[in-house]
């Protein structure tokens, strides 16, 4: 257990550095579900209906992700929130959108059908820790560009021992003073769960345009040096209870991204129904191939 925590937290400290400015909201509203294997098609169909309703009637927006490495059939839906007040406002807007699109009774049935697709679900409200994040975008446009161009996300949940939160944060800030001087570092987002979990949990998340972006990252020894690395290992044993790492890929077909993110890569975030178009084209071609001129028809 300790060894696993040590190696997962290697990622945490190596990725933490200063923040330029708040780019998009102070909170992340996160909904995580595990879908029954036999219900995947129903789950996707219902989600796409919710997407259509929220688009047409100005409801909520979100980014959907699917597990690549981690527990199977797990999906995460993440929305930005400015504050608690906006959570209420957006929830009301999403409910109103569903009622307008489907009617109250049909909307409630769809919600029951959706829940029947799930093995379990969990909601978390996470506060962005800009003071612990590294190389975050300087403004909303840069943030939208980073998210819009990303295709995979690695996130590590770090569970801190009771009474050691201050020590944990202090060490991260100390380590980042060294880590931020390293030239080969990428943006990293740190958040802390404030609603919906036991104990104290931090999430450290990194984005890449492909899995290859995780190759050839600097090691902890490269960043901290031998003495700093030893200090890190000691702190990790004393302050960290457990860690869990998950790798997700973005799911554009289940997302309803904010327009500023979608227009960065419209072909990805708003995929065209190419399968339906291709099927129609093949059917037409097949019909044409199967038809013969009257003169060529065999005589009866």
Annotated model-derived regions:
Residues 1-4:
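N-terminal secretory signal peptides that target proteins for export/translocation
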Residues 6-7, 295:
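Sequence-pattern detector for short linear motifs
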Residues 7-18:
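Bacterial N-terminal signal peptides
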Residues 22-230, 235-300:
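Short S/T/G/P-rich N-terminal loop/turn motif that feeds into the first structured element of a domain
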């Amino acid at each position: 257990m300790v060894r696993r925590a040590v190696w997962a937290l290697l990622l945490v400290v190596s990725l933490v550095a200063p923040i330029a400015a708040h780019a998009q909201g102070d909170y992340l509203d996160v909904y995580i579900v595990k879908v029954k294997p036999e219900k995947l098609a129903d789950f996707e169909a219902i989600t796409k209906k919710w997407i259509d309703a929220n688009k047409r009637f100005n409801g909520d927006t979100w980014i959907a992700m699917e597990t690549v490495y981690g527990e199977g059939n797990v999906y995460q839906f993440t929305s930005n929130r400015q504050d608690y007040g906006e959570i209420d406002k957006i929830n009301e807007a999403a409910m109103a959108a569903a009622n307008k699109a489907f009617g109250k009774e049909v909307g409630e049935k769809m919600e029951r059908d959706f829940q029947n697709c799930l093995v379990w679900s969990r909601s978390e409200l996470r506060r962005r820790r800009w003071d612990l994040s590294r190389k975050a975008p300087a403004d909303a446009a840069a943030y939208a560009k980073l998210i819009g161009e990303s295709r995979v996300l690695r996130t590590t949940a770090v569970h801190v021992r009771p009474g050691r939160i201050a020590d944990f944060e202090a060490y991260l800030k100390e380590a980042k003073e060294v880590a931020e001087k390293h030239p080969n570092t990428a943006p990293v987002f740190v958040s802390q769960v404030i609603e919906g979990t036991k104990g104290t949990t931090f999430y450290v998340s990194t984005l890449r345009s492909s899995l290859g972006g995780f190759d050839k990252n600097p090691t902890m020894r490269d960043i901290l040096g031998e003495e700093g690395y030893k200090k890190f290992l000691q702190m990790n044993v004393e302050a960290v209870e457990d860690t869990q790492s998950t790798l997700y890929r973005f799911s554009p077909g289940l997302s309803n991204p904010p327009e500023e993110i979608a227009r960065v890569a419209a072909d990805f975030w708003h995929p065209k129904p190419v399968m339906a178009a291709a099927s129609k084209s093949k059917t037409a071609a097949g019909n044409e191939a199967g038809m013969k001129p009257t003169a060529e028809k065999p005589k009866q």
